[in-house]
Amino acid sequence: TLLDLIECLGTTAADFFKETEEEQVVFSEQGYFEKIDEAGNSIQWIVPTAQRYRMEPLLVVVQPHQSLEEDKPHDGEEFGYVMSGRLNVILGEQIYHVKAGESFYYPAKKIHRIENPGQRPAKFIWVSTPPMF
């Protein structure tokens, strides 16, 4: 019978026929959360529920001659795409220069920091895994 098949699948009739909740796929600005630090740098969580997932995408604006807080080594990886301006990505003692239209990717095994050496705000998409913020 159908109930025997459901039992063989290791579930109950209620769970078998329960409609699954649809995951949100599209996120709009109304759901974004923003944090602005003392220097005026902005971090926007563009997928507000990202803590539940494996990646955490952020929209970040770093003000001229400012930097984000230094991050300690951790398990995970970080990726960024610079939309406007330019950044220095500092991994340990090494400095990498990244300009608009370029991306960066690194394992987060060293102390790392992102700074804006330019005269204009730098805007970039930043994705970390696992979620950090």
Language model: regions and residue ranges:
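Short histidine-centered beta-strand/loop micro-motifs
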Residues: 68-74, 115-117
